[in-house]
Amino acid sequence: TGELGLYKKLDSEPVKYTHEDEQYYKVHFESMLNYERTFAEQHRLSGLLYYYMSSEQKMNKDIDDKDESLRSMYAIPIRYQGLSGRITYGLRDTYFLDLNFGYTGSANFAKGDRFGFFPAVAVGWVPTGYDWVREKLPWLDFLKIRGSYGTVGNDRLTNTRFPYLTLLKTGDGGGWGSTNGYITEETIGADNLKWEIAKKTDIGIEGKLFGERLNFVVDVFYDKRDGIYQERQQIPDYAGLQKMPFGNVGKMVSYGSDGNISFTQNINKNMSFTLRGNFTYSANEVKNWEQAVQKYDYQNYSGYVNNAFRGYIALGLFRDEADIAASPKQTFGDYLPGDIKYKDVNGDGVINDDDKVPLSYPNYPRLMYGFGGEFRYKNLTLGVLFKGTGKTDYYFVDDNGYWDKGKNGEGYIPFYGGKTGNVLKIVADQSNRWTPASYSGDPSTENPNARFPRLSYGKNENNTQFSSFWYQNARYLRLQEISVNYNLPAGRL
C-alpha cells in the first residue's frame, strides 16, 4: 500500500467560451422550357430554354466590427442570372446539328460589362446511317464523326468582390511630420474588366465493330483562353502607384487527347472475357504572361508551359580544385570538389539568378493511362486493373529552392534539416556519391558523374539549388486492383 501524492501543476481559471454570430442565405430560381418533335419519321427537332437567377449573402459580425470596407462588400449580395438555350436537329439519325448559347450576367463586373454571350455549335455525322455502308461493311456496326466549337466565360477572376472598383483607405499621419489624416488609393480598380473567355474546339470519333464486340472513343481538343486576370507589371514607377492594377491581359492555350477502347469475346456459353484501356494526354503553352521586361528571353513566361519548373542546368560535379578555378564563379556560398557544377547560361562568368532557365513541366502527369479486363466463367468473375502515368517530372528539391521549407527531399537528402536528419544507405554508399581519394584510397571515387555530390555535414547552399541535377522521371505503372466476384443464383438465396 502507499499514499497518493497530489501536485498542483496549473492554477485554476474561470471557464471561457467564445461566441460567433454568422448568417447566410441563398435564393435560387430556375425555369425550363422543353420542345421535342419528329417530322416525317426522318427529322428530329428539339429545343430547350433555361433561365436562372440566384442571390446569396454571408453576414459575419466579426468582419463587420473590424473593417468598414469588408462590411460594405458583404452587405451587397452575390448575384447571378442567365439565359441559355439549345436547338438540336437530326436527319435520319445520320446528320446532327446542335446550336447552343448562354447569356450570363455577373455582379463582378461594372455596368455595361456584366453580361456575356457565349455561343457554341456542334455537328455530327454517322456514316453507318447509310444502307450501302452497312451492306458493304457489315463488320462496322456504328461509326460517328463529330466536332464542336464554343466559348465559355469565367467571372471567378479573383477572390475580391467588385474588382473593377478603386478602394480608398483613410489613416492618420500623412508623413513629413504631419499628424493630419489622409486618404489614399488602397486598390486600383480594373475599370475595363471583362469576362475571361475560353474558346474550345473538339473533334471526336466513336465506333463499334464486329457485332459491337470492339468499342472505341477518341477525342482531340484545343482550348484558347483569353483575358486571364493578372496584376499589371509593366507600369513604370513614376506613375506613382503603390499597388499595380489588374487587367485581362493573360493568354494561354491547352491541347491534348483522350480516349478509351474495349473488346469483349464470348468463348462459349459459360466463358467470356473483356479487355479495356484508356488514356488522357494534355499540355499547355503560355501565350502572354504579364511580367516586367526581362533581361533574357528565357526568363519570360510567355512561350513556355504554365508553372514550368525553373532552375539551373547541372553539368555534373566539380572534379578538383583546378576544375573549380577554370569554371565560372558560383554565388551560393562555399563549394569544393564534389559539389554540383552549374552552367553559365548567359556567359557572363557568374552563376546567379540570371542563369535560371525553364527545366521542365510542373510535377503533374501529362499522360495518364489505364488498362485491365475481366474473365468470366459462369458466375465467377476475375478482374484486374493497371494504372500508370508518363511524361511526369519530379525533383528531389522543392521548387522554392529551399530544402528546409519543402518536403520533396525529406528522407532523401542528407541532413535535410540542416544539422539534423538522416543519411540513407543509398547516399552513404561510396559507389553512388563523390568521395575524395584521400578518404577512399581510390582515385576513381572522385567521379564527376556520381549520382550524389560529396557528403557534407549541415546544409550545403551550393548543392541545395533547384537544378536539373535532382531531376527524376516519375512515370510509373502499378497494379491498382485485383477483384474476385461471385454471383449467387437467385434460387439459392
Question: Predicted segments — roles?
Answer:
Residues R86, F332, G372:
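Short, surface-exposed charged micro-motifs
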Residues T1, G5-R310, N462, F466-L493:
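Extracellular/periplasmic, surface-exposed regions of secreted and cell-surface proteins
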Residues T187, D355-L359, R366-F371:
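Glycine-rich, charged/polar anion/phosphate-binding loops
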Residues G250, T264-N363, Y394, G401-D404, ...:
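Conserved small-residue
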Residues N278-T280, L367, F371-T381:
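P-loop NTPase catalytic cores that bind/hydrolyze ATP
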Residues P138-D141, R225, E285, E374-Q465, ...:
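C-terminal beta-signal and adjacent terminal beta-strands/loops
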Residues S106-A107, R225-D226, Y361-P362, K391-D393:
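A short local loop/turn or secondary-structure capping micro-motif enriched for an aromatic residue
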